[in-house]
Amino acid sequence: MSRPEQQLKKMLKNPQAQYAVYPTAKVERISTTQHMYFIATRPMFEGGRNNVFLGHQVGQPIIFKYVSKKEIPGNEVIVLKALQDTPGVIKLIEYTENAMYHILIIEYIPNSVDLLHYHYFKKLEETEAKKIIFQLILIIQNIYEKGFIHGDIKDENLIIDINQKIIKVIDFGSAVRLDETRPQYNMFGTWEYVCPEFYYYGYYYQLPLTVWTIGMVAVNLFRFRAENFYLNDILKGENYIPENISETGKQFITDCLTINENKRLSFKSLVSHPWFKGLKKEIQPISELGVDYKNVIT
């Protein structure tokens, strides 16, 4: 048995491990044109369109994402390659495929969890929530500058290093080319995060939609996961403004979640909102998170 295979089996049997993989999972080999990997046979996550597995290679855990070819095309691979060196974006290490699936081999961020589970049992303090949202805005700006829109910004698609409080954006299956001028009539993201103009009129513009989803993420960071707020709650007139946060924080959320898209906070003005006064406009690179993948896959 090879050392990477032994390491993966040891990880799977550790009841305290954060990998959330079933300890009874078997280990199989998977080969690409460049490398041999070892992968658990039971997923960490099962979704409607993809499954995510833990794998191992060259002494480091990695993620395997299987995306059904029947459900969606391989756009995610194209987008991740284009965003390869973009700060705050999950890194695609390698890609392969079989008859049924696109197989994305993706970096694993240690000590991390998605934001949905991060605030599952707790409401975040304003200082922490503000820094998370500011990071998110900077990352989305980086994606925007490369000519793309993520298309499905939500708690589940943001992972956070629980020690350093640094986030990364994942799951680019709904990402599309940026088009600021034309209305869009197809919604590829999550319905609960849809903007009101699409709900009412069946169209949206990409940047106002992005601002809306950022506002939704901000609202939900101040709530327990079971209390997550969505479009229908706002349209019903329920109060979505968190209590016990600053007036500038309340104003930011209100500005993002304005029903009239023409009065909503503009995408380009997000970063200069008074709520973020004093925060540095920088995103820490992957090597500072504890794993330098440039030296892992050779």
UniProtKB/Swiss-Prot annotation:
Induction: Expressed in the late phase of the viral replicative cycle. ATP binds at residues 45-53, 65. Transmembrane segments: none annotated. It holds the Pfam family Pkinase. The active site is at 152 (proton acceptor). Its EC number is 2.7.11.1. Residues 38-276 form the Protein kinase domain. It comes from the Viruses. GO terms for cellular component: host cell cytoplasm; virion component. It is found in: Virion; Host cytoplasm. It catalyses: L-seryl-[protein] + ATP = O-phospho-L-seryl-[protein] + ADP + H(+); L-threonyl-[protein] + ATP = O-phospho-L-threonyl-[protein] + ADP + H(+). The keyword Transferase applies. Gene3D superfamilies: Transferase(Phosphotransferase) domain 1. Essential for viral replication. It may mediate the virus' progression through DNA replication. Belongs to the protein kinase superfamily. Ser/Thr protein kinase family. This is Serine/threonine-protein kinase 1. It comes from African swine fever virus (isolate Tick/South Africa/Pretoriuskop Pr4/1996) (ASFV). The lineage of its organism: Viruses, Varidnaviria, Bamfordvirae, Nucleocytoviricota, Pokkesviricetes.
